[in-house]
Amino acid sequence: MFEQEQWQPTANVETLFARAKIINNIRRFFTDRGVLEVETPILSEFGVTDVHLSTFSTEFVAPQAERSKTLWLNTSPEYHMKRLLAAGTGAIFQLCHVFRNEEAGSRHNPEFTMLEWYRPHFDMYRLINEVDDLLQQILDCEPAESMSYQFAFQEFVGVDPLSAERPILVELARKYNFMCDLDEDRDTLLQFLFSTVVEPKIGQERPVAVYHFPATQAALAQISSEDHRVAERFEFYYKGLELANGFHELTDHREQLHRFEQDNVQRAKLALPQREIDRRLLGALQAGVPNTSGVALGVDRLVMIALDKKRIEEVMAFAINNA
């Protein structure tokens, strides 16, 4: 009756054993360094305001409740982990499932495993070094190369991303078949050119850390005190994959509120639904999150590289098309 159902896992059993060993090694890396493992909710009362993230939601119907309550599946454990930092946990890490209502393909699955950790009193560069240590231990790779976003853009695109005028960026984007108008959002143009032109040319032989993204792409990172055009944000790339995204974390609750509000302004311009701002995160920031750097790393992609797999479903027990 059910013989034709595709019940088998998308990863073979040998791969699942290898994946488990890698995850155990990740845990050992942090416990050996005295970093506390934590667990936080997958469901949250607040979604994310970021215009580039699409989220899943569900309705919670409590007994005797007059109406249901919308809850959001987290795109990251970041907000809850920062509340723990404000409570005084010190350095923490987490391995968890996160959800993004976006594409599914060779590198993406709507549900995936994230490693996220926070290091109070680390600056961005010290955390970059720790990510490098982790990659060397898990992947047995060469030490990472580091370059600024500005340098990478100038080297491979041929223009300065911090000063190039919009018409120049539009012309370049069209050269690479991006259909856009002259009034296209500047960051959209930069992100397209970076992903299309720069990313394929870096991190092939060894991991590469790209740091100091434009201030307009700061997200939850601090703006550099040395150059207000850039944010204290970095990303790691290796073997054609974006592996990690890290920040010298913004801890000013007023600035964070302003950024959330600006996200909703941008959402209105793009005809996207408004998102309620996470007041609990702002309360934690106001109470006092220590000076901290944090990073999120895609575990499935890390396993892909470690085991030389080309598609993300090859390292997952069940991908979205077989869940």
Curated annotation (Swiss-Prot):
Enzyme Commission identifier(s): 6.3.2.-
Domain of life according to the entry: Bacteria
Residues engaged in binding substrate: 76-78, 118, 249
Coiled-coil annotated spans: none
GO biological process terms held by the UniProt record: lysyl-tRNA aminoacylation
Enzyme class: ligase
Annotated residues for binding of ATP: 100-102, 109, 242-243, 298
Any GO molecular function: ATP binding
Reactions catalysed: D-beta-lysine + L-lysyl-[protein] + ATP = N(6)-((3R)-3,6-diaminohexanoyl)-L-lysyl-[protein] + AMP + diphosphate + H(+)
Keywords: ATP-binding, Ligase, Nucleotide-binding
GO CC annotations on file: cytosol
InterPro entries assigned to the protein according to its UniProt record, in alphabetical order: Aa-tRNA-synt_II, aa-tRNA-synth_II, aa-tRNA-synth_II/BPL/LPL, EpmA, Lys-tRNA-synth_II_C
Function per UniProt: With EpmB is involved in the beta-lysylation step of the post-translational modification of translation elongation factor P (EF-P). Catalyzes the ATP-dependent activation of (R)-beta-lysine produced by EpmB, forming a lysyl-adenylate, from which the beta-lysyl moiety is then transferred to the epsilon-amino group of a conserved specific lysine residue in EF-P.
Family: Belongs to the class-II aminoacyl-tRNA synthetase family. EpmA subfamily.
Subunit structure as annotated in this protein's UniProt entry: Homodimer.
Entry protein name: Elongation factor P--(R)-beta-lysine ligase
